[in-house]
A protein has these predicted regions:
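Post-Walker A helix-loop "phosphate-sensing" segment adjacent to the P-loop in P-loop NTPases
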Residues: 1-10
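Hydrophobic residues on the short alpha-helix immediately C-terminal to a glycine-rich phosphate/catalytic loop
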Residues: 1-2, 25, 29, 81, ...
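A short secondary-structure junction motif
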Residues: 2, 52-59, 108, 112, ...
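Conserved P-loop NTPase-based nucleic-acid remodeling module centered on helicase motor cores
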Residues: 9-103, 224-227
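Conserved helicase NTPase motor core
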Residues: 13-15, 21-24, 41, 67-74, ...
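Short alpha-helix boundary/capping elements
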Residues: 22, 49, 108-113, 181
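Alpha-helix C-capping/helix-to-loop hinge sites
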Residues: 32, 36, 59, 81-88, ...
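Coupling/switch/interface segments within P-loop NTPase motor domains and analogous charged loops
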Residues: 72-144
């Protein structure tokens, strides 16, 4: 319908959450319209984020050739960062492991909640962990910046930051993405919802979701975003 109304494929942004959903979405679009899927801006939030950051990320100090860390590599970098700052922390039997800390940090970033609040929630109010874990998170972020690497959460967080801090980029997105279509919206978190809101200042958004299929609450997914 949008194509029939004269909207160019390259001005339609198609977003979804998982790689599987993205493949299915783009295949359906190509089958229904006869237009090659590559003519649209389409894919997961993370895929679109990395495309935009490689092209427009300079104001945030991001080089086009930055490397994306998979989950294992990101956890290893965090572990090495912790070891450099406080080797005894990881040796203590009762302290949370690097993988656990990575989950706390990721959850805070995706939900846009203060890391301190997440730490207290996960440790039943133990404030002893607040200062060191926040220090580890800051050092981890600096290590990524210095090495020009990004974890999956960076692809969203930096995209949002760029929309907020770079008016030229925000205007480009609003002009380029005249129509925004989001599938599997029940799996989006607050960070992704903020991205959609900042892109679609024209309010031309169609979102599809099913609350019974919301399975990523452990990563901050909120079906309420659709309202």
């Amino acid at each position: 319908w949008l194509l029939d109304q004269g909207v160019e494929p390259g001005r339609i942004l198609l977003l979804t959450f998982t790689n599987k959903a993205a493949r299915e979405m783009l295949a359906r679009v190509e089958s229904l319209t006869g237009v090659p899927a590559t003519a649209f801006w389409g894919g997961t939030f993370h895929h679109i984020g990395q495309r935009l950051l490689r092209r427009f990320g300079a104001p945030l100090g991001i080089e086009p050739g930055f490397t994306i860390l998979d989950q294992g590599d990101a956890e290893l970098l965090l572990q090495n960062t912790i070891r450099r700052l406080d080797a005894d922390f990881l040796k203590a039997k009762d302290n949370p492991k690097a993988k656990t800390l990575a989950n706390w940090i990721s959850y805070a970033r995706n939900t846009r909640e203060p890391l301190e609040d997440i730490i207290l929630e996960r440790t039943m109010g133990n404030r002893d962990y607040v200062e060191p874990v926040c220090e580890f998170a800051d050092a981890y972020r600096e290590a990524k910046r210095r090495q020009q690497v990004a974890d999956y959460d960076d692809l969203l967080e930096l995209w949002r930051d760029l929309l907020e801090k770079d008016a030229t980029f925000a205007e480009w997105c609003a002009d380029r993405f005249q129509e925004v279509l989001v599938d599997e919206y029940q799996d989006t978190n607050r960070l992704q919802s903020e991205i959609v809101d900042r892109i679609a200042t024209h309010h031309r958004v169609m979102a599809v979701g099913d609350d019974s299929q919301c399975i990523y609450t452990w990563r901050g997914a909120e079906f309420g975003n659709i309202t």
